[in-house]
Each structure stands twice: as structure tokens, then as C-alpha cells.
Amino acid sequence: MITANSFERTIGGRKLVIESGKLARLADAAITIRYADTELLVTLCSAKKPREGVDFLPLTIDYEERMYAAGKIPGGFIRREGRPSEQAILAGRLTDRPLRPLLPKEWRNDLQIIITVIASDKENDADIWGVVGASTVLAMSEIPYEGPVGASRIGYINGEFVLNPTFAQLESSQLDLVVVSTRKAVVMIEAGSKEIPEDIMINAIEFAHKANQELIDLQDEIRAKLGKEKLPVPVLEIPEEVKTAVAAFVKGRVNEALSHQDKTARENAVEGLQAELVAALSETFAEGDILAAYDKEIKKAIRSTILEKDIRVNGRGIKQLRQLDAETGLLPRVHGSALFTRGDTQVMAITTLGSLQESQQLDGLSAEDTKRFMLHYNFAPFSTGEVKRSGSPGRREIGHGALAERALVPVLPTPEEFPYTIRLVADVVGSSGSTSMGSVCSSSLSLMDAGVPVKKAVAGISIGLITGENDTYCTITDIEGIEDNYGDMDFKVAGTRDGITAIQVDMKVKGISFDIIRDAIYQAKEARYNILDVMDKALAQPKTELSPYAPRMYKINIDPSKIGSVIGSGGKTIRSIIEQTNTTVDIENDGTVVIGATDEASAKKAIKIIEDLTKDIEAGSIYTGKVTRIMTFGAFVEILPGKEGMVHISELADHRVEKVEDIVKVGDDITVKVIEIDNQGRVNLSHRVILNPNAVPISRNRDSQPRRPGPFRPSDRSNS
């Protein structure tokens, strides 16, 4: 048996075990990390040589879910794992975002961390353990790394914080918060919440940071025993003579180029100055060094103006929002639409409503099987005036869409209140920063324009950060793209007037203090109120009527014991209803039936069929049915779907009838009255009392009158 190094802790009342040396022994570093009965294999491999022609850290983090982990066989034709699920992509981003700032920017060797979920107890989410596992293999490896980090999930249930809540606990939690932090600072925050107040959110982040310390202690213990000697950080210095020459050439001109409020004018001015600079110095210095030095001059100009003058490069104040505009009812025919504009950033959001049958089917390790609310974010290259490949959404688009989706979920009506599947598409048509928060604003308005009865409007804002010497800093409201590029943080907060619904924090520095976190959260609250004021002017309440082009959903309730009658053998009956009426039919286990139709007549037709299928035949009631069979003694009539009664020959007319066929034939419609339901549940009908209401129906025993002729027996001849 292969021996392994094993390290244990008890975290949140469950056992955490990290082992190394048993699996993936050819990787540069590898561990398994198990929390309760959820287990992941985490590996790190690094290229031996730097990659040529790159000016960034080539880090790739792949998060892979194995369906066997939960005892499942993958769906689809080939029955094997294919492209990562949306949840897997988000889990990969959750790991990448906090680790990247802690690795040297100068590192050019390819790094690949693969996180594979190999066991899932369906109670504990694996995503945060991917973060802890990735941090552990980096700490063990020879890669320079300013970690380790701890990652904790925090719930808020009945006024108490819960460390690493289970899926079941999250159902009743007001908060789903993930915090990643080093020993001293927070490096990543991600949260979804049900309008949590700002002070509770800050306390939850502090609670998580304290919980992370035990995970950091554990990784330090592993590193002390198994860690390799770290490689030196590569030195990528710009020659001093280049920096001096560039600074002298652009002195005073960089601030002038950056001062344009219009994004296009600003970019043209910056690029024009760059072209002049390269033309003047390229014969003396390498172009790459010139461009790197110029980039540093731009960064210095942006940051110094903010820190020293409290003014941003385009003249805006530290807390000043860009020009805002909101519009609804933008497009014809669609179910709901809105456009939200913030400076040069524009997001158009379209709402489409469908039946619950159109919910997304999830094939992954998440606790949910279906999803009735989807927000899809698209970022077209024309939004930045560029020519790029346009294709399927990447990780960034999926992440931005998930954030906006998370921000809106707390205000959505329940399926019982609004039995629709809701799809939102947020199309970015102009981008100068903060498109994800623009998507929240436009999507909130689009839902209201579609008549979705959301509880409140939701707005989002990004808060940036500029840090200086001696722990000085400045938080800035509503960052533009250039401030995001050259700043230190993107602190996104979405919420209503009553609290926070989502947070996502990314940073380029190696962590932020709680003073910065508090300033950012309260600064975002002030800005959010101002944005909601503008949104309210466009549309303050959801429309009371749906679009005439949206499907209508009608809800009825049936006896749960009659569900089988509606579905039929192998679904035959319900398929027939859908085909006959051109509707959709969803049935819940409690007997709730939701019928979706494009017109009222189709819905009413489907409702009548379902009600007839589940209705009990009552004595004295009158029905119009169809003749299904004819016997010598009478006719059988289907008076409700699948339910027959018999009209005796003497009850077919108000005169003597010689042959049943003289009055009715198979397929004829006939109105009858239920005159008796005998002790065996058989239904006797009369057409005679319909023709003559004063006629008295005859009660008869049908035991001697079988529904179908019986087989010939010798005794029949002797009785004749």
C-alpha cells in the first residue's frame, strides 16, 4: 500500500483531511483534500522554460467535475463529461481570482492547476476546497507565492453566522458569502444575499477572515514538512535611461491626453502621444521598453491625480457618477426590454418568458436539477470599437452573467406567484467599464417592463481603489475602464434600497484592509441610491400587464390522486392534451397544474380537458358525450375523458325503439343524464329524460346485461 502524508483539522464541525504522496506523483505538487465526504484532487504543473512573447502571468486553473463523484452517469448521447458546466467555470474563476495577485507578475513559465472533484456527498460545496487545495499545492511547490490563503463560506441563519453551511442550510440562509484571505488581508469576496444590511455584511467578512486563519496554519504546517525551496522571482526591469527619456518626452502631455471625458477622444489622444513617442525614441531604445515605460507614466498620472488632488483624469470627483440614463420598452414584440447608460457604457437587457417546462436542465454536481431564471451576458467586440473574434461566451462572460443573475434572484417572485421560466439577455452595446453592474440595472428594468412582479428594483455599482505610500488610499465611485486597468481593485456591489443582494471583489494588490472594505461598501450604498432614483424615473413599478406576445400561464389544482389520469400510460394522455390544444402543461406532485398558452381559448380548452379527466361523475348531472360502442341492449357513451356510461335501449327515446342503431351510431354526439350509479360504480344514462323532462327513468340491474357479449356457452342454447 502506498503511504501518504496526511494532515487533519476539524473545521465547522466536520473533518478536513489533506493528503499528499498517494495520487498524481509525477505532478510538481499534488494533494487530495477531503471535507466530510466531498473530495478533490488538486495538481500543479509548471513549464520548465518561460513562454516566448507573453507579457502576463500564464496561469491556467481548470475545475473539473467527475459525474462518478456523485454516483451519476453523464447525460447526453455519448454519456461522458464534455465541456465544463457553468458551475465548474465559476468555481475555476473563484480559485483564479484570489491566487493571481499573490503570484509574481514577472513569472513567464506556464502554470496549470487542475482541480478535479472525485467524490461529492451532495451536502458540502466543493468550490472553496478547490481554493484551499490550489493554495496548498502552490505553497508546497517551488513557485514563488505570497500565500497561503484560506477560503470560507459563511451563511446567516436566524441571526447567527454559520461556517461552511451545507446545501440544505443555504436554503434557509439570508447570505451565501465566500471570503478568501491571507494572514493579514482579504484578497477576494463573493456574495449573494437577501438584502443583507451593510453592517451585517462587514461583520460576516470579518467572521470569515478569522475562520481562514486555521486553514492558513494548516498549510504552513504542510509547507514546513513538504515544501520545496522557492525559485527566485524573475527580474524584468526597464532600463533607467529609457524611463528618463520617456518621462521627459511626455512630461505634462500625459495628463492633457487623459483629461478628455469622451472615451474615444481620450484613447485617440493617448495613442497619438504614444505614436509620437515611439517615432522619436525607437532608433535609440527598444520599442518594448518604450511602451512599458509609457504605460508606467500613464499609470502614475492617473494615480497621482487622484491621491494628490481628489480629481480623476477626466475631471470627475472621487464619488461622482458618470451621466446616467435609463429607458424601457425599447424593442417591439419582445416580452420586456430596457437600456441602461452610464457614460459610454450601455447595456440593453431583454426579458423572455416561457413555461416552467423550458427551465434549464442542469447536469452537474450542484444541489439543483433545474433552473427557472437565467441571465446571459454578451460582450460584443463592437462595444469597445474593436475588431475581434466573436463566438460562444468565455469565462468572463459567464462570470459577469452569473453575478448579475445572483443580484436579481432575491427580488424575483416564487414559481407559485409567477409560474414562468424567465430568461434575461444582457447585451453590452457600449463598454467603458462596469458592464456587469450596468447589466444589473438594465436587467432589473427589463423585468419590470415585462410585467414580472419583482419585489424591488436592483442597481449595481463598482468602487475602485488607488493606493499610495504609507498606507494611504482613495476609494473611487463608478470606475471607468482605464481606472480599472490602472487601479488596484474592482469592488462590485448590487442591491436594493433595503440591502445588498450581491458582491464581487477582485484586486491587483495582495489584499485589502477592513477600513477599505467598509469605505467601499458604504460608498456603494450612497451611489446605489442615486442610481435607483434615475431608474425609478424610467419605471418605478412592474407593469401590471404582460406583453401581448408573452405566453399566459393559468393555474388550477387537482386531486393529487388523479395526477395519473392526466398523465396517462407512458405520458400518452398529457401529450395528447398538449398536441390538441397547442399548450404546455406542468404538473406538480401536490396537484398544482400550470397551463401555458399563447391565447386564452387554447388555455381554456386544455383546462376543460384536465378538469373532465379529474372530475367524478355525479348522479343527476347532464353531459354531452360520444357513442363509443353499440350493443343489442343499449349504447355506451363516453361522457368524460376515459369514463363511460350506458344508455339502455329503453332510455334512448321517448317511444319504443326496436334497434339501437335506429337512434344512434358509433361516433354520434348525444346528451344524456346520469340516472344512477350502481353499487359497482357502473353508470346508467338516459337520453329519454332529456327529450321529456317529465319522464321517470327506470332503475335497472345491469348484472344480466354485460358491457360486451360474453363467450358462447352450451348452456346458452338450453336456455333459449
Curated annotation (Swiss-Prot):
SMART domains: KH (SM00322), S1 (SM00316). Keywords: Cytoplasm, Magnesium, Metal-binding, Nucleotidyltransferase, RNA-binding, Transferase. InterPro entries: ExoRNase_PH_dom1 (IPR001247), ExoRNase_PH_dom2 (IPR015847), ExoRNase_PH_dom2_sf (IPR036345), KH_dom (IPR004087), KH_dom_type_1 (IPR004088), KH_dom_type_1_sf (IPR036612), NA-bd_OB-fold (IPR012340), PNPase (IPR012162). Its cofactor is Mg(2+). The keyword Nucleotidyltransferase applies. One of its GO terms (biological process) is RNA processing. Residues 697-720 are annotated as: Disordered. Residues 551-610 form the KH domain. Residues 620-688 form the S1 motif domain. One of its GO terms (cellular component) is cytosol. Mg(2+) binds at D484, D490. Its EC number is 2.7.7.8. It is found in: Cytoplasm. It catalyses: RNA(n+1) + phosphate = RNA(n) + a ribonucleoside 5'-diphosphate. GO terms for molecular function: 3'-5'-RNA exonuclease activity; magnesium ion binding; polyribonucleotide nucleotidyltransferase activity; RNA binding. Belongs to the polyribonucleotide nucleotidyltransferase family. Involved in mRNA degradation. Catalyzes the phosphorolysis of single-stranded polyribonucleotides processively in the 3'- to 5'-direction. This is Polyribonucleotide nucleotidyltransferase. It comes from Dehalococcoides mccartyi (strain CBDB1). The lineage of its organism: Bacteria, Bacillati, Chloroflexota, Dehalococcoidia, Dehalococcoidales.
